[in-house]
């Protein structure tokens, strides 16, 4: 009997120790989620101990349940529930849709364990020594407190690699100091690997495995048709450009592209050889694979150029194992405990700093190792967003959305899915919808093309045929003011283009390669075309070049010899002939000159369209079939220029995509508008000398405001002020109307008059919510009026009010720093400019004033560094003469360069 009792005691004691060990194991699993073999081993240990304790637990319950206190019985019920939920988790897994089950398992087992140990302590169970109860209490306390301490520590001391922080003191003075420098195998890309070594190709060829076993099939299908998938040599436009780059500029410089376009071949060293040798390999066709974004371990800063560090996950060899048993075991572990997998592929910046994460590849500059010239801005989508109202970080926007938005809010919207990672039946779309209609067209992906088309047409940009201007008479809005004209009249039609659902400039990206233009057509009552600007020179009206006299939204870059940069040869760009974009929440006013024919009838119909073609016609022809003109042998070509001519007769049988001929990418009408002009005879109406004929109500407040914004941005300050005065006449309580009048007067230099209207704006500001983002602009512009009059203290007071609301607005910070410098408070000025650099390390105004401030402080070492950075980022005036060559070579581009211009009809019978 004693022997049996002793065995039973040993049995219970061993099971109790196993229970305590399970508590500690659970505490570790709750505290960490490390993608390591040690953590994975603990997951298995958790299962083994848990299953192993079931027989002991069953025997204990059968013998002791009847004699237990109520607290003990409750504990048993909870632990039984925990066992059932644990076994269920082993079958269905703890993926996001089953998160509730995991949480339930944790809660019931935790509470049950606490109650059971309390029962043991209070009831003094006979088979447990008193010392064991103390150990149990300590174990329970450790198991409960340890995860809490770890969570608090991580919250207050986040891992430094996951913080996106711009340098202040270590900003590179040249591209040679960026990334890993010249010793990096990936230079001149700023991208690096965690070890500095190459990464096996197979790592980037496993995207399809992400769809296996029902994990992420929807994500994979979406990505498979996206522009990210076709970022590399499976994209003919990119392929031709890089081949040309390697031919003209050398192989090394093409790595500058590789960090964001070709990680599969750059990180394995293949890009050290001509791409023609490997163009059709799986690695060259991989694009931006799942692992390319999700294995990024660190985002270094927001200076772009692929400024990230990528890490080969420690468990990837197991995931990619050729052994089916090992892979099945790996897949089961991911399903059972996805946390290590999640930690490997989802970093905090993937969720919290999404815009900064996107900046790594959506902000670009070139420098000497790439362009054999100097620092030159490529595109800068990140800063456009950061300084705008859309981010709620910019103080000076004309309009603000109710809530701030990031890149993913528009480009990765929530869509229905049953993928393992879904939350309440939704996932972030991995189509990355943007504006690339060309790739889904040539790849024959109708779903992607439809998604992109719908995205473009979803009120992202709108147009408004707004005003009729006849000499000094303005009739607006045309549709509500019974706009009239007379036969023979020479009138101007103003069309307003407004950005609404765009979080960056419209357009954005490599805008020199796009065809985005406004088209205006006028027809008489018989349907005869009497005016047409912006047509396409082709029989079908589609497959041809756009009317060069049209109003374009693009940039026109020129090379060292003044040639147009038309082959995506950005390394040869030396200056910009013109660049026309519209910031978020802003507008552009486009002017057309129309002569009313004598025989046009009683009415003229105006139709305006904002057209979009992803790649311009010439670039598409060149990308697919461009070869050197055999008749043009006397040409010059070097790294900085190409004077050669091209013909489009090349072989297209091996081009990327499903279409093996020169394609005709679709033209999408982003927005359109229509209006009617009434044509009356001279003797049927009385002469009216009124300068402004309008019929407006509160609904037209925004239309007039947009009209004024467009005129203001062009520099038509008087016209803009007249429009804004109309705005405040319609709605005297519209604060922004007065602010916009002040903008015009400040630009004119009429600061005292601007001060008067800003006082009215200040009165209206008092009625706004303290968090209303529109408040700060009143303080900013009022500060400018005070600064111009030497009232620096008042100006500083208002600027600090603006910066308190918008601490990341560079313009506000720089104004504060400038005033502090003028007041000879140099150390304080340095502090302000450093705050600017925390947001944008390439801000030229900040570096200029830091140079001045350090000189004033006699800190020559820092002054020299600031001077180097200022000279690096400032515009190069020495290239200005090149623009003259480009302007003479292209008179249409020269006209587009003008801030204010009138567009004429391009049809032959009305060519003036």
Features from the language model and the residues they span:
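TPR/TPR-like (Sel1-like) alpha-helical repeat modules
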Residues: 844, 848-879
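Structural signature of tandem alpha-helical TPR/SEL1-like repeats
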Residues: 714-726, 747-765, 774, 779, ...
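Helix-start (N-cap) detector for alpha-helical repeat units in TPR-like alpha-solenoids
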Residues: 701, 735-736, 769-777, 810-811, ...
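Structural marker of alpha-solenoid helical repeat scaffolds
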Residues: 730, 764-771, 805, 839, ...
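Primarily the internal scaffold of c-type cytochrome electron-transfer domains
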Residues: 124-128, 133, 153-198, 219, ...
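Membrane-embedded alpha-helical bundles that constitute the cytochrome b-like, heme-associated redox core
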Residues: 1-165, 174-175
């Amino acid at each position: 009997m004693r022997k049996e009792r002793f065995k039973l005691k040993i049995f219970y004691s061993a099971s109790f120790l196993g229970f305590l060990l399970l508590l500690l194991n659970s505490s570790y699993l709750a505290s960490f989620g490390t993608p390591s073999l040690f953590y994975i081993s603990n997951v298995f240990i958790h299962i083994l101990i848990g299953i192993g304790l079931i027989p002991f637990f069953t025997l204990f319950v059968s013998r002791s349940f009847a004699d237990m206190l109520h607290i003990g019985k409750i504990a048993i019920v909870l632990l039984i529930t925990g066992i059932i939920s644990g076994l269920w988790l082993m079958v269905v897994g703890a993926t996001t849709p089953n998160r509730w089950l995991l949480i339930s398992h944790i809660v019931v087992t935790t509470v049950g364990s606490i109650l059971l140990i309390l029962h043991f302590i209070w009831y003094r169970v006979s088979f447990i020594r008193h010392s064991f109860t103390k150990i149990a209490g300590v174990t329970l306390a450790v198991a409960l407190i340890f995860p809490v301490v770890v969570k608090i520590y991580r919250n207050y001391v986040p891992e430094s690699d996951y913080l996106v922080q711009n340098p202040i003191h270590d900003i590179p003075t040249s591209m040679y100091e960026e990334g890993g420098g010249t010793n990096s195998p990936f230079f001149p890309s700023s991208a690096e690997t965690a070890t500095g070594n190459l990464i096996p190709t197979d790592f980037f060829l496993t995207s399809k495995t992400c769809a296996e076993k029902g994990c992420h099939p929807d994500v994979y299908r979406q990505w498979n048709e996206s522009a990210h998938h076709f970022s590399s040599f499976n994209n003919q436009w990119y392929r031709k450009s890089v081949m040309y780059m390697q031919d003209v500029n050398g192989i090394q410089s093409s790595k500058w592209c590789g960090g964001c376009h070709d990680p599969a071949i750059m990180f394995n060293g293949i890009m050290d050889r001509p791409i023609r040798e490997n163009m059709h390999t799986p690695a060259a066709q991989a694009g931006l694979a799942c692992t390319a974004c999700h294995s990024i371990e660190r985002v270094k800063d927001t200076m772009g150029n692929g400024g990230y560090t990528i890490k080969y996950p420690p468990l990837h060899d197991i995931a990619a194992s050729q052994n089916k048993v090992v892979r099945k075991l790996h897949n089961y572990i991911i399903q059972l405990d996805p946390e290590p997998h999640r930690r490997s592929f989802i970093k905090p910046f993937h969720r919290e700093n999404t815009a900064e994460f996107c900046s790594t590849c959506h902000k670009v500059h070139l420098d000497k190792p790439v362009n054999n010239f100097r620092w030159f801005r490529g595109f800068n989508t990140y800063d456009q967003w950061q300084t705008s109202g859309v981010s709620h970080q910019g103080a000076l926007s004309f309009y603000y959305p109710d809530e701030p938005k990031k890149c993913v809010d528009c480009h990765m919207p929530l869509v229905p899915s049953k993928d393992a990672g879904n939350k309440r039946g939704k996932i972030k779309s991995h189509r990355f919808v943007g504006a690339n209609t060309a790739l889904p067209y040539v790849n024959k992906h109708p779903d992607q093309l439809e998604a992109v088309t719908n995205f473009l047409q979803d009120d992202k940009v709108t147009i408004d045929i707004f005003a009729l201007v006849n000499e000094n008479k303005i009739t607006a809005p045309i549709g509500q003011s019974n706009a009239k004209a007379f036969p023979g009249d020479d009138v101007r039609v103003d069309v307003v283009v407004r950005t609404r659902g765009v979080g960056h400039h419209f357009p954005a990206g490599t805008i020199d390669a796009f065809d985005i233009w406004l088209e205006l057509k006028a027809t008489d009552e018989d349907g005869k075309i009497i005016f047409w600007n912006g047509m396409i020179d082709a029989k079908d009206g589609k497959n041809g070049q756009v009317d060069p006299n049209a109003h374009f939204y693009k940039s026109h870059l020129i090379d060292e010899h003044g040639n147009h940069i038309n082959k995506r040869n950005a390394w040869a760009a030396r200056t910009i002939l013109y660049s026309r974009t519209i910031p978020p929440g802003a507008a552009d006013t486009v002017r057309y000159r129309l002569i009313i024919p004598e025989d046009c009838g009683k009415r003229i119909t105006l139709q305006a369209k904002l057209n979009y073609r992803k790649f311009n016609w010439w670039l598409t022809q060149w990308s697919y079939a461009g070869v050197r003109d055999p008749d043009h042998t006397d040409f010059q070509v070097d790294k900085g220029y190409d004077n050669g001519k091209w013909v489009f007769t090349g072989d297209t049988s091996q081009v990327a995509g499903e279409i093996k001929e020169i394609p005709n990418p679709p033209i999408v009408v982003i927005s359109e508008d229509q209006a009617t002009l009434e044509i009356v005879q001279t003797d049927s109406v009385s002469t009216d000398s009124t300068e402004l004929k309008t019929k407006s109500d509160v609904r037209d407040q925004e239309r007039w405001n947009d009209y004024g914004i467009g005129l203001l941005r062009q520099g038509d300050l008087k016209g803009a002020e007249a429009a804004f005065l109309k705005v405040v006449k319609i709605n005297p309580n519209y604060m922004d109307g007065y602010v916009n009048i002040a903008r015009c007067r400040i630009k004119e230099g009429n600061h005292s008059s601007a001060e008067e209207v800003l006082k009215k704006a200040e009165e209206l500001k008092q009625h706004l919510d303290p968090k209303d983002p529109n408040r700060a602009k009143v303080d900013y512009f009022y500060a400018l009026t005070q600064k111009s009059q030497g009232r620096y203290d008042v100006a500083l007071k208002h600027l600090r009010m603006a910066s308190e609301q918008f601490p990341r607005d560079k313009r506000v910070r720089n104004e504060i720093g400038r005033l502090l410098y003028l007041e000879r408070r140099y150390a304080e000025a340095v502090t302000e400019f450093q705050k600017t650099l925390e947001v944008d390390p390439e801000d030229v105004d900040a570096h200029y004033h830091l140079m001045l401030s350090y000189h004033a402080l006699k800190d020559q070492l820092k002054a020299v560094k600031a001077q180097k950075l200022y000279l690096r980022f400032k515009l190069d005036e020495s290239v200005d003469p090149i623009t003259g060559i480009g302007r003479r070579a292209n008179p249409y581009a020269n006209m587009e360069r003008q801030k204010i211009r009138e567009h004429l009809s391009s049809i032959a019978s009305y060519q003036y």
